[in-house]
Amino acid sequence: MASDGEDISVTPAESVTSATDTEEEDIDSPLMQSELHSDEEQPDVEEVPLTTEESEMDELIKQLEDYSPTIPDALTMHILKTAGFCTVDPKIVRLVSVSAQKFISDIANDALQHCKTRTTNIQHSSGHSSSKDKKNPKDRKYTLAMEDLVPALADHGITMRKPQYFV
């Protein structure tokens, strides 16, 4: 070592050698030795078998990787961020997308059922049916109206009122 103001010129090879010397000294410390040996001595951990719910959830998550939902993941991530839920796990985002898709589908199906019952009740109460009404029910086209959507949303706990005036 240099002392008393001596000039030392160190080549890059010598500086690397001196750096590895210090690393070897660090490994010789008792703390580092215990960490090295702890990797070798793994305690026996008993694996707990998955319950049926956990195995079904794992299977669902694996199936979601290949499925592309109607609601894009980017839209779901944006809505989650605006609601204050930030996540980087794409599995959670995909699960929320599929859940939202099912919720919307359930509401649309309920509204369709309300529309069908409303139109059949109107036909039976009027007492007369024209040739147009005798079409096959599968050929009939239905239009989503507020009259059908409000009770469908009420079935799911969402209160919605038709505005009295349009501005």
Curated annotation (Swiss-Prot):
Keywords, ordered alphabetically: Cytoplasm, Nucleus, Transcription, Transcription regulation
Entry annotated with the keyword Cytoplasm: yes
InterPro entries in UniProt: TAF10
Region of interest (Disordered), ranges: 1-56, 119-139
CDD domains in the cross-refs: HFD_TAF10 (cd07982)
Functional summary from the UniProt entry: TFIID is a multimeric protein complex that plays a central role in mediating promoter responses to various activators and repressors.
Stated name of the protein: Transcription initiation factor TFIID subunit 10
The species this protein was found in: Drosophila melanogaster (Fruit fly)
